[in-house]
Amino acid sequence: MHENTFDCFIAHAGIFDEEALYYTTEEMWFADWDNGGLGRGYLSGSPWSEYPEAVRHYAHDPKLNVEKWNTPILCFHGGMDFRIPYTQGMAAFNCAQMMGVPSKLVVFPQENHWILQPQNALYWHRTYFDWLERWMK
């Protein structure tokens, strides 16, 4: 997909399935605005929207390109993230594993969209830099 452009990926609260996210996020304004609705009102950025921006947005959904994945990926997620549920990171990790792509999933059960507890933030940063050190050429 990226034709060896990147040595590795790191996704914090990453989105794997845009359509599923549309139905599961706690903040619908973001779902409509970010998905191509551009302030036209609720449902304007929905998966069934006919606005060209929304159609283009969903055409680039990561889940549609799993068969092209070959870059190692580290996925971080907060277990209490209601903006982007942790199952998005789990889905990306599971697909990477099924594709034989080196991958790691780190879920902080007591954290939300941000990793705020000091011990967790320290672990996040250590894991982040360890991943880069491992895969950067």
What are these regions (language model features)?
Residues 1-137:
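Active-site-proximal cap/loop segments of hydrolase catalytic domains
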